[in-house]
């Protein structure tokens, strides 16, 4: 999955028309921030991203977008769950060689 595909899914998730480009710069920045946050969690991302990785990046970017409107909002449990599962899965694969 490419960053352009992630942007398309993010726009759909946020109910932003695909033809609207006025927020693309902001959304692309949020995608980049999400990539950094996910890797800081210890998750290794492939190139190109798998569907699971792309979805995780999109979910994180959507969370950051929504948090801008409500700074008191907490991370959705589904996002935290996905982060934890991906990290544990990768660590288990490393241990099992």
Where are these regions (language model features)?
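Conserved short "hinge" loops at termini or chain/domain junctions
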Residues: 1-56, 87-97
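Short alpha-helix boundary/capping elements
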Residues: 35-38, 65, 69
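Protruding loop/beta-arch "assembly-hinge" segments enriched in small, turn-prone residues
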Residues: 67-97
């Amino acid at each position: 999955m490419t960053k352009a595909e992630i942007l398309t899914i993010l726009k759909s998730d946020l109910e932003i028309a695909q033809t609207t480009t006025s927020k693309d710069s902001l959304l692309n920045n949020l995608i980049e921030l999400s990539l950094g946050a996910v890797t800081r969690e210890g998750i290794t991302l492939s190139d190109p991203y798998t569907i699971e990785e792309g979805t995780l990046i999109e979910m994180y970017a959507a969370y950051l977008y929504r948090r801008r409107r409500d700074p008191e909002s907490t991370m959705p449990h589904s996002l935290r769950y996905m982060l934890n599962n991906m990290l544990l899965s990768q660590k288990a694969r490393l241990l099992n060689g």
